[in-house]
From Swiss-Prot:
Originating organism: Helicobacter pylori (strain J99 / ATCC 700824)
Protein name: Large ribosomal subunit protein uL1
Family under the similarity heading: Belongs to the universal ribosomal protein uL1 family.
One Pfam family recorded for the sequence: Ribosomal_L1
GO terms, biological process: regulation of translation; translation
Gene Ontology MF annotations: rRNA binding; structural constituent of ribosome; tRNA binding
Amino acid sequence: MAKKVFKRLEKLFSKIQNDKVYGVEHGVEVVKSLASAKFDETVEVALRLGVDPRHADQMVRGAVVLLHGTGKKVRVAVFAKDIKQDEAKNAGADVVGGDDLAEEIKNGRIDFDMVIATPDMMAVVGKVGRILGPKGLMPNPKTGTVTMDIAKAVTNAKSGQVNFRVDKKGNVHAPIGKASFPEEKIKENMLELVKTINRLKPSSAKGKYIRNAALSLTMSPSVNLDAQELMDIK
């Protein structure tokens, strides 16, 4: 098994040049050619930003609804009450509740990919914050997941909303589609993501904003992208 994996990786690495920087269009083309798994691999972009997340004013966090979705069926949980529960259900939410949902989560129920809540339910959500937080599921106003417009939030989540947040080392990782997507759709999704991240550049960030960029599949080596080209996307 290990020998087969090594041969597969060796073949993939032979298709790229480690020290080469690719333009967006060529990079997408190369990454698609690396698809070799028996499942539809996820295309992921990784950006190294010139920010220091230790400073609150340099924390880059937000959300973007990809033009062509992520290719993944997203299950959405909503914390709401009264008429807002009905709005959530009508919009297609998979799980809707209040204190009862919090109790289910405490008992181990995590069968959803995104959590949305109305502002008045955040006290209830806070009771399971230690469970949701480490899994990246805690609702936040910056990602549009704490809102009174529940229908819109659920629709966005189902349509391919991607939430992103810079990590401690200044990196942002985000899925932008599947290997089966046409090149143009992958490219357009990536440009929409990068455009959003560029808009969120902190005024206190110094020097080059996007320092490095790479594109990869779930089971492939990464391809280096032209960071300057990405910074020029408005």
